[in-house]
């Protein structure tokens, strides 16, 4: 009998047969695609040898162009040339108009308030535009590898929220790609450097791209990549350098009109060219809208210094979160084209006390890391022992009685992760429970962020505390959160996948963490008070039910003592004296002990009525 050749699920049946995978850096300004060939990760170039693909799409009635061809139309047809679409991903129209009031596009709101861009090809959302960029990258990879891709790893900023990550997945699906995983950009950079050097210790990944800034503090140990802490700014990058310089040129050239989109694009192009030139030269001559002038590196540095300082403040916060000092960081990895700016490299080197790593092209390092990970996930390296442990930036939890937040998954927990906690009903006969998912570090609901609400219905009508509900939080490798609530005895359950329409900015995250530290003592006291008030309400609710059912077991004098104790508890529970409430609860318990014993005896007698001793 011939033997059947078998293989691990998801792997090729033939040991020598490689599956085709690619890593995609879907950037704000530029995008890249990379793959692993002959054991080496490399980015793939177009027919003209260019590795970067500008993240720009130009739309016409009969089609569209992507990349360099699209970018040439930016100044001529601004309204139909979409660039930096990554900034729009997962955001509401109101949010976009507030953050980016000078975008040269016409928007309409969809039924759910999400942005639709008016183009010659019709109304398009950011997901569709991103899909067109991904299609162009996939076509480049398919041609270079002479075959269809089996899967891709796409990188996203560490601070992308659920809606932005889901939008990226939707764009890939629209482009016909199978997403193996979304990978945080700093983690991808750690893969690119860590695998080559095999170095162990703490590494900082400073990622300043076109539209986002991320700082990650990583620990590399025995093949394990663990993100100790993350920080950054989802609305800060080289684009902001460009806009600052463009505004400066506008002032120097005395161009007051901001409504002319063509002039605005010309100014931006001039600013970008000047920024690049100033990385090597001390000064550069600029020609725009009939004006000619000179800009020095010193002037440029003065313009961008406040933004660079903002990135270093985020670095300091991330180090504090990670519990490490700057001098403990062995290496600083530079990622993103904006890290070529001399002032950035200089200030980062001063902050960490060592020159940053730039041996891998900062534009390519993320795509290379994604390609290495894709090669593993597609099954080409089944023996790889590399692990990736990303973290969640803010704690996740539930609202409980009294307006308290019960944390289920603490901040900086590595993902993927699943945690569960058991809860119970508060009132007799309660058949439904509202599940309120919270995010934040404070103790009270009012001080945290609401993520989602859903209801679990069909709970058996039992006495208070009789039903047991298990609530499970699951965060997958892409940072998407699913919450499931299940009543144990019946198996009835309800769940929700959290997809906020738009997420927190880095400053809001930093503010929430800072507030949790500033108000720590106050929050603990507030929580203790709320817990005692909830317990007081539970005791009074239970006592009232018992008195309604079995008041006949008490004499008038005994009833008066219990009523007085209950009235006192009800009164002090309205105040904010934790000790007084606790003592009043103990007093009610003391005064009702005999009553509770009589009720128990009566229940036993009722249960035994009509039965002989032998039957018992």
Swiss-Prot record:
A single BP term in Gene Ontology: iron-sulfur cluster assembly
> SUPFAM superfamilies this protein is in?
Actin-like ATPase domain, Heat shock protein 70kD (HSP70), C-terminal subdomain, Heat shock protein 70kD (HSP70), peptide-binding domain
Transmembrane parts of this sequence: none
Protein family: Belongs to the heat shock protein 70 family.
Q: Which domain of life is it from?
A: Bacteria
Pfam families listed in its UniProt record: HSP70
* Entry keyword annotation includes Phosphoprotein: no
Name the species this protein comes from: Shigella boydii serotype 18 (strain CDC 3083-94 / BS512)
Q: In its keyword annotation, does this UniProt entry include ATP-binding? A: yes
Q: What is this protein called?
A: Chaperone protein HscA
Q: Which InterPro entries match?
A: ATPase_NBD, Heat_shock_70_CS, HscA_NBD, HSP70_C_sf, HSP70_peptide-bd_sf, Hsp_70_fam, ISC_FeS_clus_asmbl_HscA
Task: State its role.
Answer: Chaperone involved in the maturation of iron-sulfur cluster-containing proteins. Has a low intrinsic ATPase activity which is markedly stimulated by HscB. Involved in the maturation of IscU.
Alphabetized UniProt keyword annotations: ATP-binding, Chaperone, Nucleotide-binding
* HAMAP family on file: HscA (MF_00679)
Question: What GO molecular function annotation could you give as one example from this UniProt entry?
Answer: unfolded protein binding
